[in-house]
Amino acid sequence: MKKIFITILLAALMPFAAGAQDARQRTAETIVADALAQLPAQTPKAFASLMQELAATGADGIRMMAAMLVPAAEGKNAPVEYAINGVVSYVTAAGREELAREIRAGLTDAVAASTDKPNQAFLLSQLQLCATAAEAPVYVTYAAHEYLADTAVRGLIAP
């Protein structure tokens, strides 16, 4: 009788244990891969949800996506650029300052890690959209570079 009671009790508790497994326990790599696979989103609501998930990956997510950028001769960057731009746009909304801080940190790291000048210019332009005065040294670093000077100076004079 005791075995039956324990078996029934365990069987009754199983749904609660399964419910405790939240899909949000995914790794940043999984979130980025899933979001990129779902872009372009079918509705604005779905797009906002994907951008929220990507923004929640913080600096790590931005660095991962930036690492996926390849030189133009080697492939297409449109899906990744679309995702990065969407995240930057998402975090610039009022009340998302903490997310924006993380995204700025990721973009700053990504610019430094990138070796492709057009990709660096893209990342600098995205940083410009969410930058604060604290990011000025990033732009100063690239202001003397022949290819990146225009983008860097635009970042310095942006409001």
Placement of each model-derived feature along the sequence:
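Residue-level detector of extended alpha-helical repeat arrays and alpha-solenoid scaffolds
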Residues: 43-47, 62, 76-81, 120, ...
